[in-house]
Amino acid sequence: MSAVTRCEDGLVLRLYIQPKASRDSIVGLHGDEVKIAITAPPVDGQANSHLTKFLGKQFRVAKSQIVIEKGELGRHKQVKIIHPQQIPPEIAALTE
């Protein structure tokens, strides 16, 4: 499975999360996953909620449209984005 997969109602992303980064950003490919740096610490679900908020802004969807399918407690996650309104250029380059 590739880092970004299209499905009938959106996109499925395989992510590697770097918590406690200096800024929020989509870094690029990390092996067969997309690396995302976020500023939140990995404590009490703060990183997950910050990740859904960050992805919501990037794809212009509500936080409820972002589902963490796998990896709730780890750095390796599989996230589904339902009906994205826009696709960031870093992700669009990986779908081709």
From Swiss-Prot:
GO terms for cellular component: cytoplasm. InterPro entries: DUF167 (IPR003746), YggU-like_sf (IPR036591). It holds the Pfam family DUF167. It comes from the Bacteria. PANTHER family: UPF0235 PROTEIN C15ORF40. Belongs to the UPF0235 family. NCBIfam families: DUF167 family protein, PRK05090.1. HAMAP family: UPF0235. This is UPF0235 protein YggU. It comes from Salmonella typhimurium (strain LT2 / SGSC1412 / ATCC 700720). The lineage of its organism: Bacteria, Pseudomonadati, Pseudomonadota, Gammaproteobacteria, Enterobacterales.
